């Protein structure tokens, strides 16, 4: 159950970060309304708050979170930007998830 909870928190955190960064991108690069910065700020504030809910030390959390972030970013690529990930993208995600699992669930007495 702990693994599922950690994965869930990491996933929600990644979505908050991606939304918070994607909305300014839409404003700066694609000419959308500057008002997108308002929900972007809320999303990034939620991202920071969500990081405080993670069960491990900050450095370990950030390192492990990166694996989930990569996964969610590629899902975003596919679902929001309509660009299908390549096989090497998917292999990279698998490697990142394995790395995240080693960091989060590996023994601490070494």
UniProtKB/Swiss-Prot annotation:
Pfam families: UPF0060. The keyword ATP-binding does not apply. The chain crosses the membrane at residues 6-26, 33-53, 61-81, 87-107. Keywords: Cell inner membrane, Cell membrane, Membrane, Transmembrane, Transmembrane helix. InterPro entries: UPF0060. The keyword Ubl conjugation does not apply. Signal peptide: none annotated. It is a multi-pass membrane protein. It is found in: Cell inner membrane. GO terms for cellular component: plasma membrane. It comes from the Bacteria. HAMAP family: UPF0060 (MF_00010). Belongs to the UPF0060 family. NCBIfam families: PRK02237.1. This is UPF0060 membrane protein Ping_0587.
């Amino acid at each position: 159950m702990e693994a599922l909870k950690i994965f869930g928190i990491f996933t929600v955190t990644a979505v908050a970060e991606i939304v918070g960064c994607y909305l300014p991108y839409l404003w700066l690069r694609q000419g959308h309304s500057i008002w997108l910065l308002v929900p972007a700020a809320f999303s990034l504030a939620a991202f920071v708050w969500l990081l405080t809910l993670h069960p491990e030390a900050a450095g370990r959390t950030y390192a492990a979170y990166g694996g989930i972030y990569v996964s969610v970013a590629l899902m975003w690529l596919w679902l929001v930007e309509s660009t299908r990930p390549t096989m090497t993208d998917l292999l990279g995600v698998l490697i990142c998830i394995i790395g995240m699992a080693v960091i989060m669930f590996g023994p601490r007495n070494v």
